[in-house]
Amino acid sequence: MAFCGPRTAARLSHSTRALHYTHRGHVSQRTLNEVVIASAARTPIGSFQGSLSSLPATKLGSIAIKAAVERAGIPGDEVKEVYMGNVLQAGQGQAPSRQATLGAGLAISTPTTTINKVCASGMKSIMLAAQSLMCGHQQVMVAGGMESMSNVPYCMSRGATPYGGVKLEDIIVKDGLTDVYNKFHMGNCAENTAKKLSISREEQDSFAINSYTRSKAAWDSGLIANEIVSVTISQKGRPDIIVQEDEEYKRVDFSKFSKLKTVFQKDNGTVTAANASTLNDGAAALVLMTAGAASRLNVTPLARIVAFADAAVDPIDFPIAPAYAVPKLLSEAGLKKEDIAMWEINEAFSVVVLANVKMLDIDPARVNVNGGAVSLGHPIGMSGARIVGHMAHVLKKGQFGIAGICNGGGGASAVLIEKL
C-alpha cells in the first residue's frame, strides 16, 4: 500500500496545477478558421504630459483590455492568450503585456506576449492573434496596443562616468523616433518623401486642418464615443478626475499653421509641428475569436478579418510602405481598391497619408473620414490597434475597410476587414 507523505502530496499538488494550465496550450489543425472581431475598446488619447500622464502604459492597457472583454459579453476566463503592442518599454518592469493582462483581471494562467514593431505594434498584435486563431491554436484572444509617451525615461550608457559629466538620451527619440540607419529623425524621412512625390507644405497644412476638422465633427456627432472607455484618475483625497474624451484635437489654433517654422529642414522644409502627429498616451484592445467560438458564446461580432499583410522598403522610405502592403491585401482577398468603402492610413505625418493616397490612387474622400493621428494623437504602440477598432465600429454592414500603418525601419502593416 502506497503512502502519500507531505512531499508526495506537494508534488501531486504541483502536478495538478500544471495540468490545470495545459488547457491554454497550442493545438494546430489542417483547415483555417474564420476570425471575427467581437469587440473593440480604447481609452481616450491624452496629450503629452496631459490628462493621462499619471498612468503607465500598462495601466492604460489594463483599462482597454477589461473594457473590450466586458463589451464582448464573455467571461474573462474565455480569453486564452493576449498580445499587446508596446514600443517604449524602458522602465516599465518585466513583460508589459503581462502586467496589462493581470491588471485587467484576466486569469493568471493567461499567456501574454509584448509586440514591438514600432508604430505598427498594435496592428501586428492583431495580425499575430488572427494567425493563431485561424490555425486553431486558440479560440479567443485579446490583441491591442498601449503607450504612455509621457512616462518614457531618459537613459545613459553604462560604464565609468566620463570627465566632464554624463549624457542623457531621450528614449522617445532614441527608440521611437530615430531612423537608426540614416541616424536622423523620422521627420527627415517624411521630408524626403515630400520631396520625392512633390508634396508641398501647403498641401500638408491643408490636410492637417482637415484632420482636426474631421475629428471634431466625429466627436460632436457622437460617432467616436462608442469605442471609448473612460479613465478615472485618482486625486488622493480630492474628487477623482474622469477622462472620457480625446484631448489633442481641441488644442489647435488654425491661424498659426502657416506661420510655424519647419522642424527638420530649415531650408525648403515642409514638415511642421502642426502637420505632424504629436506625442501621446493611450491604449486600445480588441477581442478576437473564431467564428465557432462566437457562435458558442452567443457573441454578435462587429466584423471579420479578411486578410492582412506586411511590406518593407528602404528605411528612409518608411512613409510609403503601406502602399506596398495594400496590393497584397487586395490580391489575397480578390478585391479591387474600388471595393473598399473606408481607408484608415495612420497619420504619423500628413505627408504619409498624402503620399499613400497618391501612390495607391484612391479617393481621398474615403480616407481617414473621422480624422487621424495628426489631430487625435499618436501613442505609437496603440495607433495600429486604434484604427482597426475604429473601422470595426463605423463601417456599415457588408462594407470592406482597410487600415494601414507605416513603421520605422521601412516597414508597414495592413489589415482588411468586413463589417458584419
Swiss-Prot record:
The keyword Acyltransferase applies. InterPro entries: Thiolase, Thiolase-like, Thiolase_acyl_enz_int_AS, Thiolase_AS, Thiolase_C, Thiolase_CS, Thiolase_N. Keywords: Acyltransferase, Fatty acid metabolism, Lipid metabolism, Metal-binding, Mitochondrion, Potassium, Transferase, Transit peptide. CoA binds at residues 212, 251-253, 256, 277. It is found in: Mitochondrion. GO terms for molecular function: acetyl-CoA C-acetyltransferase activity; metal ion binding. The record marks 378 as: Increases nucleophilicity of active site Cys. The active site is at 119 (acyl-thioester intermediate), 406 (proton donor/acceptor). Pathway: Lipid metabolism; fatty acid beta-oxidation. Its main location: mitochondrion. GO terms for biological process: fatty acid beta-oxidation. Its EC number is 2.3.1.9. Residues 1-33 form a transit peptide. It catalyses: 2 acetyl-CoA = acetoacetyl-CoA + CoA; propanoyl-CoA + acetyl-CoA = 2-methyl-3-oxobutanoyl-CoA + CoA. K(+) binds at residues 212, 273-274, 276, 374. The keyword Lipoprotein does not apply. One of its GO terms (cellular component) is mitochondrion. It is an enzyme of class 2 (transferase). Belongs to the thiolase-like superfamily. Thiolase family. This is one of the enzymes that catalyzes the last step of the mitochondrial beta-oxidation pathway, an aerobic process breaking down fatty acids into acetyl-CoA. Using free coenzyme A/CoA, catalyzes the thiolytic cleavage of medium- to long-chain 3-oxoacyl-CoAs into acetyl-CoA and a fatty acyl-CoA shortened by two carbon atoms. The activity of the enzyme is reversible and it can also catalyze the condensation of two acetyl-CoA molecules into acetoacetyl-CoA. Thereby, it plays a major role in ketone body metabolism. Homotetramer. This is Acetyl-CoA acetyltransferase, mitochondrial. The gene is acat1.
